[in-house]
A protein has these predicted regions:
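Short, well-structured beta-strand/strand-turn elements
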Residues: 53-61
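N-terminal capping segment at the start of a domain
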Residues: 5-33
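General structural feature for long, well-ordered alpha-helical segments within catalytic domains
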Residues: 4-12, 35, 39-43, 75
Length: 112
């Protein structure tokens, strides 16, 4: 299977463009900020466009979908991920930096 790395990178950069920073003051409500639900709606639409089945989004911002098996012998797999980011991290916009040919050494995030 060939991976379209440019398409994957574009999708990743799209996801990080959403401000999904959590609100510590609003910790009894899920999602805690409107931006989290905006990303959830976007993910739901994208999963539908990709042809997944049983795509749903609930009032708490949980996005679920089913990708049917393409073979009779495959194991069932589940992927779970947060869409929110820490209130201590910048909320956005986030600028990505792509490191090509990573050599395994430390990556300096800020030269200051």
């Amino acid at each position: 299977m060939d991976l379209d790395t440019e398409k994957i990178l574009k999708r990743f950069e799209d996801y990080i463009s959403y401000n999904t920073q959590s609100d510590e003051e609003n910790d009894q409500v899920y999602p805690s900020t409107p931006g989290q639900m905006v990303l959830a709606r976007h993910l739901k639409e994208e999963l539908e466009q990709l042809g997944l089945q049983e795509v749903s989004l609930d009032e708490n911002g949980y996005v679920m979908a089913t990708l049917p098996a393409n073979g009779a012998e495959g194991s069932v797999v589940g992927f779970i991920s947060h869409m929110d980011t820490s209130p201590d991290a910048p909320g956005g916009p986030i600028k990505s930096r792509v490191v090509h040919d990573y050599d395994g050494k430390d990556i300096c995030l800020n030269k200051e």
